[in-house]
Amino acid sequence: MSKELNIYLAGPRGFCAGVDRAIEMVKEALKKYGKPVYVRHEIVHNKYVVENLKSEGAVFIEELNEIKDKSRPVIFSAHGVPKSVPQEALDLNLLYFDATCPLVSKIHKEVEFFDRKQFPVILIGHRNHPEVIGTMGQTKSEIFLVETVEDVIKLPLNKDEKIAYVTQTTLSVDDTKDIVTEVKKRFNNVIEPKKNDICYATTNRQEAVKKIASNCDYFLVIGASNSSNSLRLVEVAKNYGSKKAILVEDVDSLNLNIFENIENIGITASASSPEILVKKLIDKLKNNFDLKINEAHYQKEKVYFKVPQKLKS
């Protein structure tokens, strides 16, 4: 008889509206313009998604000067790009489409607004993440990047100066709260974003993990090692009671021996990971264990971002 495992499935999980839109944009471009369609940077941080789109005719590049045939369309990734990138595309006479998530575009607009008001801008985010690079490239003025509470303390700004802050969309809700608290403590005149910059999907997926983490001996987060929202889910699972939590980048290579003395497993998928990978993981576990699956009750997300009309076939 197979060993029994209790599976706790977090919900909501998997693709968010911005990821859905970005992938749909690449597919629509392939339908309308044929192969190849160039994509600047991974459209979303997920190997499965990228490989699938490659097989359909997408060619992934990091810089526009890598485009061999300048008559072919190019799509910018969901993470957003500095203003210099669309300008370069215009200079090269490229047909381009911008798949930046609308929630990231909102932050770009906030940065531009604060810059026009001549407020120093603090960006809470992870250095070298594509989203952060894109946000910092919305203005020629200096943006002060902070990753920790300690970074806030070191900022070379006057405490009575009117300052503004924005955040990366895929941060830990808890960590960001601590940093924002420090910003407000350190400075007397802080202008906040009108709405929280951490996106609904990041928040919802972290909350879903928090609800079940304490039931779990082991937590599996399906996602990529270069995906900020995936890594934050691993941290949240550990911080909220799961004895162990790991990132699963490749279901096929997951070693099942790690579950030898385990009874309760939590599973979620990051906002850039498709539900098909959750199914694949559960099927793999079913083939080796007797599973009791506990699916979380949750409200379905009803957010949808439209693909630009000019991409429709």
Can you describe what each PLM-predicted range is?
Residues 1-265, 269, 275-313:
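The feature marks the mature, well-folded catalytic cores of soluble enzymes
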